[in-house]
């Protein structure tokens, strides 16, 4: 979920974090292919990983003398009862409805892609590292397990999206399907007060089409949109467990004409992930992202368009129950000297466009979120007080949308919502759009910054 900023803004609030399936994505490459090209990471290598759950490549070997192999009597193959790590008695369904607790009864969830960092100044112990170490390991291990669980939910749900999304599908059907899958896999339907704070959506499912880059979700009262073959759709959704939010996004197309646009954005996101690390400066990362992104062009309807990095939305750090922390990672080079620190979690995302590269507020409302710094104050409207109580009990500072309020059975809440917005208690998010006729794409991953090696928590087979 992109954070909107102003072009050229170099001053950002500094915040320190408390945490110091196989699918075919359109325009993407298998995870193994990326490892061969990148050469800088290993998927699923960690002290907690069993290490034998990955696919291996098989080569056909002919006899050295060139003779035909001798015929042998075939023996019946015995079915292997060996299960991969994390396999439970059940397999995931389509749509996904089997809770992860049944698929991973031991509570050990897959590790993300472990990325080695250069061995620079290993004897240095910074204040940030001391703060991280002083927090102890038990809480951190629990939080990391929650993160990995949220990431596995994201992977399994988006696998279903890759397998089933098609032209002619309504965006409401797709959004509800994603959210129903997340809630089912976590075992939290979120219909009782406090339940969705234990686990659920990290923010409303974003399904932005074409020139709309981000912050669109189908809501009550809007005309339902039907997906078309020529559409470019950004699928951006978050999953949280106990407030630890995994934020990851990808782009779906049905026409290969957009392949270069998707390749540019995927390359830019992977570049940002490679550059992330302890002491990395966000302004410099933005420069590398921009260089990768803008080395591409795409031909659409006989016209060649340079792919531009969008200037006024950014990646961001993630705090407990807060999808946008105080740090931002731009997609363009800037003078921002803000550093990444040990134990921080970032959403490294990039947006590319064939348009102007500058986002404007579009019509309508995507969703809302409570300001974490909102002061307690008297609200004159009873409807506003009742709505705020519902928000505190069900969402806290996690973003939500009108569909979620309707799902809880709320009615006639818009007057109370407007009161909360006018008092600065709740923020409203509009869709973010480029010029009409342009096309935008997005890819995003959640990464944990560690001096011993970063973990791309949300990495999967698809992207």
Curated annotation (Swiss-Prot):
| Cell location | Cytoplasm
Query: Signal peptide location in the record?
Result: none
- On the tree of life, the source organism's domain of life is Eukaryota
Q: Which residues bind a divalent metal cation 1?
A: 236, 247, 444
Region called Disordered, residue ranges: 1-107
GO terms of molecular function: initiator methionyl aminopeptidase activity; metal ion binding; metalloaminopeptidase activity
Q: Which HAMAP family match?
A: MetAP_2_euk (MF_03175)
Q: Which residues bind substrate?
A: 215, 324
Which keywords accompany this UniProt record? Answer: Aminopeptidase, Cytoplasm, Hydrolase, Metal-binding, Protease
One of its Pfam families is Peptidase_M24
Q: What is its EC number?
A: 3.4.11.18
An example GO CC term for this entry is: cytoplasm
Q: Which family does it belong to?
A: Belongs to the peptidase M24A family. Methionine aminopeptidase eukaryotic type 2 subfamily.
Q: Which PANTHER family match?
A: METHIONINE AMINOPEPTIDASE 2, METHIONINE AMINOPEPTIDASE 2-2
Q: Does the keyword Amino-acid biosynthesis apply?
A: no
Could you say which cofactors this protein requires? Co(2+); Zn(2+); Mn(2+); Fe(2+)
Q: What is this protein called?
A: Methionine aminopeptidase 2-2
The answer to keyword Protein biosynthesis applying to this record is: no
Which SUPFAM superfamilies is this protein grouped with?
Answer: Creatinase/aminopeptidase, Winged helix' DNA-binding domain
Q: What's a BP term from Gene Ontology annotated to this protein?
A: proteolysis
Query: What is the recorded function of this protein according to its Swiss-Prot or TrEMBL entry?
Result: Cotranslationally removes the N-terminal methionine from nascent proteins. The N-terminal methionine is often cleaved when the second residue in the primary sequence is small and uncharged (Met-Ala-, Cys, Gly, Pro, Ser, Thr, or Val).
Basic residues: which segments have biased composition? 69-83
Task: Show the ranges annotated as biased composition (Acidic residues).
Answer: 37-53
Annotated residues for binding of a divalent metal cation 2: 247, 316, 349, 444
Give the catalytic activity. Release of N-terminal amino acids, preferentially methionine, from peptides and arylamides
């Amino acid at each position: 979920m992109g954070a909107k900023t102003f072009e050229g803004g170099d001053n950002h609030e500094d915040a320190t974090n408390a945490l110091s399936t196989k699918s075919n994505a359109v325009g993407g490459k298998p995870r193994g292919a990326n490892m061969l090209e990148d050469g800088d990471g290993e998927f699923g290598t960690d002290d907690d990983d069993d290490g034998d759950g990955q696919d291996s490549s098989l080569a056909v070997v002919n006899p050295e003398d060139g003779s035909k192999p001798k015929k042998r009597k075939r023996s019946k193959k015995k079915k292997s009862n060996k299960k991969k790590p994390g396999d439970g008695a059940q397999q995931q369904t389509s749509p996904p409805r089997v809770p992860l607790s049944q698929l991973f009864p031991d509570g050990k969830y897959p590790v993300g892609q472990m990325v080695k960092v250069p061995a620079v100044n290993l004897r240095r112990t910074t204040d940030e590292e001391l703060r991280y170490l002083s927090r102890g390991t038990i809480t951190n291990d629990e939080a990391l397990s929650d993160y990995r669980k949220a990431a596995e939910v994201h992977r399994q749900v988006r696998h279903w999206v890759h397998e089933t999304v098609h032209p002619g599908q309504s965006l409401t059907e797709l959004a509800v399907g994603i959210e129903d899958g997340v809630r089912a896999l976590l075992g939290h339907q979120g219909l009782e007060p406090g339940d969705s704070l234990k686990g659920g959506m990290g923010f409303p499912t974003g399904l932005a089409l074409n020139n709309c880059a981000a912050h669109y979700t189908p809501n009550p009262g809007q005309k339902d949109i039907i997906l078309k073959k020529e559409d470019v759709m950004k699928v951006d959704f978050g999953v949280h467990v106990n407030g630890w939010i995994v934020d990851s996004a990808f782009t779906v197309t049905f026409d290969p004409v957009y392949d270069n646009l998707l390749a540019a954005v995927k390359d830019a996101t992977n570049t940002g992930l490679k550059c992330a690390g302890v002491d990395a400066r966000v302004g410099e990362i933005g420069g590398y992202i921009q260089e990768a992104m803008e080395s591409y062009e795409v031909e659409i309807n006989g016209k060649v368009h340079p792919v531009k990095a969008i200037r006024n939305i950014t990646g961001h750090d993630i705090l407990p129950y807060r999808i946008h922390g105080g740090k931002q990672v731009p997609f363009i080079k800037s003078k921002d000297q803000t550093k990444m620190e040990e134990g921080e979690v970032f959403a490294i995302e990039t947006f590319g466009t064939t348009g102007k590269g500058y986002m404007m507020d579009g019509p309508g409302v995507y969703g809302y979120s409570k300001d974490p710094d909102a002061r307690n104050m008297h609200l004159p409207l009873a409807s506003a007080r009742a709505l705020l109580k519902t928000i505190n009990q069900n969402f806290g500072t996690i973003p939500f949308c009108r569909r979620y309020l309707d799902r809880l059975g709320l009615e006639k809440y818009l007057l109370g919502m407007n009161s909360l917005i006018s008092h600065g208690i709740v923020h409203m998010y509009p869709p973010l759009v480029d010029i009409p006729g342009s096309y935008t794409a997005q890819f995003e991953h959640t990464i944990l910054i560690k001096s011993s090696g970063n973990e791309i928590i949300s990495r999967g087979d698809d992207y």
